[in-house]
């Protein structure tokens, strides 16, 4: 009787575990099926990110919206081992590092170590690399050397930004309004217009303004860190034949404002401008303070005579792309792009508090 009871008990336990495993498997399968597949072009072809043997961080446009990513600088919060810093002279210029390697100079005469591609067009200089993001299809960060497929300036990696393309035969529009700290006000809009049965136009506009976060003690010039950006993008897509597509894009990015700290220092009394004979002695004494005062949560004060003008950037870009479908999952693409920029970069350097020395 005892053996029969034990066998019945074991049989009941086995049936219960089997049902539990089946339910867990079904739940897991549903979870996997519901996951959004992220497509990457890291190898110059569309593939699932899970099939690419490259260290890559890829995000869809929906991912960026849900995470509140509105500017290229924001992606540093999503990508491990990646650092993006603003240039002290112009807030649209970025210093980008991946895995500890990257660019530390934002001047026009220096090449990047990390390439930035926007709609397959290479940005040859860092000016304008901290642009605002809206109506983006996907963003990818490739880590490690990528010279085989993306040419030079990819010693540390590459950043690929692909915007949404015009959709033929469909009208669509969207508007996004954002407000935040320091008087932040941003408005972004998109309109997709079907022109004919084989052509469409997609227009995107962005404006973003924000007050500065550095109180200027000279009393005459603007505070530091002011943001005033305007972006515009128009893309025309024409299906010339069933196999041949023409894409033309015209974009502009205007960024004006005031510089941010090159070296941080809080002034409590009359400032002494850096650069004099005692600069070496002065900077030794204030190194620790400068590091502490660069904490973004602090309240900055400084002295900066900006009578020579604020920072600005006017960047105009054009893109022409012809894509021919060869069949058998193969395409032939011709891409031609131009970029013209006019900018002025002014920065604030470390000063000294006379009472401290």
PLM ranges: what are they?
Residues 1-31:
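Cleavable N-terminal targeting peptides that direct proteins into the secretory/outer-membrane pathway or into
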Residues 31-168:
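Acidic, small-polar-rich N-terminal luminal/periplasmic segments of exported/outer-membrane proteins
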Residues 42-46, 181-182, 236, 252:
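Short polar catalytic/cofactor-binding loops
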Residues 49-50, 168, 211-214, 343-346:
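Short acidic/His/Gly/Ser-rich catalytic and metal-binding motifs that mark active-site loops
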Residues 80-84, 188, 304-305, 318:
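Short structured motifs
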Residues 93, 113-115, 207, 348-356:
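A short glycine/small-residue-enriched secondary-structure motif
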Residues 111-113, 125, 134-143, 148-218, ...:
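Outer-membrane beta-barrel translocator/receptor signature
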Residues 221, 227-357:
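Outer-membrane beta-barrel domain signature, strongest for Gram-negative TonB-dependent receptors
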């Amino acid at each position: 009787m005892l053996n029969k009871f034990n066998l019945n008990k074991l049989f009941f336990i086995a049936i219960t575990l089997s049902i539990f495993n089946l339910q867990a498997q079904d739940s897991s399968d549903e979870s996997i099926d519901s996951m959004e597949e992220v497509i990457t072009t890291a190898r110059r072809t569309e593939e699932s990110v899970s099939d690419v043997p490259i260290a890559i961080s890829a995000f869809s446009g929906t991912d960026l919206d849900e995470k509140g990513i509105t500017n290229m600088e924001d992606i540093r919060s999503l990508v491990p081992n990646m650092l993006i810093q603003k240039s002290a002279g112009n807030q649209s210029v970025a210093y980008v590092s991946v895995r500890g390697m990257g660019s530390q100079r934002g001047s026009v005469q220096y090449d990047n170590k990390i390439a930035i591609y926007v709609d397959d067009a290479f940005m040859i200089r860092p000016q304008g690399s901290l642009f605002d993001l809206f109506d983006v299809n996907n963003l990818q960060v490739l880590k490690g050397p990528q010279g085989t497929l993306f040419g030079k300036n990819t010693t540390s990696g590459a950043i690929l930004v692909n915007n949404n393309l015009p959709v033929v035969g469909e009208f669509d529009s969207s508007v996004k309004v954002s407000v935040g700290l320091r008087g932040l006000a941003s408005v972004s809009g998109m309109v997709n217009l079907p022109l004919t049965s084989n052509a469409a136009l997609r227009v995107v506009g962005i404006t973003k303004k924000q007050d500065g976060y550095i109180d200027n003690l000279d009393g005459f010039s603007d505070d530091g860190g002011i943001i005033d950006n305007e972006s515009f993008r128009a893309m025309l897509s024409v299906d010339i034949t069933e196999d041949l597509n023409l894409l033309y894009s015209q974009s502009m990015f205007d960024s004006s404002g005031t510089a941010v700290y090159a070296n941080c220092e809080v002034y409590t009394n009359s400032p002494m401008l850096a650069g004099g004979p005692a600069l070496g002695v002065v900077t030794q004494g204030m190194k620790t303070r400068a590091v502490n005062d660069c904490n973004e949560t602090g309240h900055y004060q400084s002295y900066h005579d900006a009578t020579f003008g604020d920072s600005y950037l006017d960047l105009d870009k054009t893109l022409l792309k012809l894509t021919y479908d060869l069949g058998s999952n193969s395409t032939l693409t011709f891409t031609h792009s131009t970029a013209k920029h006019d900018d002025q970069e002014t920065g604030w350097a470390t000063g000294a508090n006379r009472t401290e020395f």
